[in-house]
């Protein structure tokens, strides 16, 4: 069964988005021209607001070409938009930090999102032992 998501566009000039068959991510585009100077931060408007189904959230990340094409990184590594952010004026943004002077044009694909189920309710139970030996971590796999 296909999930339906209600979407509102900032205005009629925004490119309509859709999911393509070749992947699990949906591209998002800049809603306006944005100039960012090196070492500057800006919220790039994406021109969409959505009403996610109950129990789901959106994960927003840069496209693989975002840094190469625009010289920006997403400041929070991954954006998480939960089901409560669904008002008529709750438009999505891409938090961009520029590592060089750059121009992002209206319609440029700069990030992507996917819909994920929210984490189930959990209870953290404090214990003295976890039942296994220390395994290393921090790059230790396969070094012995």
Curated annotation (Swiss-Prot):
DUTP binds at residues 64, 76, 85, 93. The active site is at residue 82. Gene3D superfamilies: 2.70.40.10. Its EC number is 3.6.1.23. Its cofactor is Mg(2+). Keywords: Hydrolase, Magnesium, Metal-binding, Nucleotide metabolism. Binds 1 Mg(2+) per subunit, coordinated entirely by the nucleotide and ordered water molecules. Disruption phenotype: No visible phenotype; double yncF-yosS deletions (both encode dUTPases) are also viable. Pathway: Pyrimidine metabolism; dUMP biosynthesis; dUMP from dCTP (dUTP route): step 2/2. CDD domains: trimeric_dUTPase (cd07557). Belongs to the dUTPase family. This is Deoxyuridine 5'-triphosphate nucleotidohydrolase YncF. The gene is yncF.
């Amino acid at each position: 069964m296909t999930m339906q998501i209600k979407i509102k566009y900032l205005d009629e000039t925004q490119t309509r988005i859709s999911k393509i068959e070749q992947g699990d991510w949906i591209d998002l585009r800049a809603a306006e021209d944005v100039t960012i100077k090196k070492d500057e931060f800006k919220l790039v408007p994406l021109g969409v607001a959505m009403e996610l189904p109950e129990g789901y959230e959106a994960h927003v990340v840069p496209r693989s070409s975002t840094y190469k094409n625009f010289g920006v990184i997403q400041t929070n590594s991954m954006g998480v938009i939960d089901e409560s952010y669904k008002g008529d004026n709750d438009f999505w943004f891409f938090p961009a930090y520029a590592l060089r002077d750059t121009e992002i044009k209206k319609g440029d694909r700069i990030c992507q999102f996917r819909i994920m189920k929210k984490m189930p309710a959990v209870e953290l139970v404090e214990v003295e032992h976890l039942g296994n030996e220390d395994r290393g971590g921090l790059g230790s796999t396969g070094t012995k």
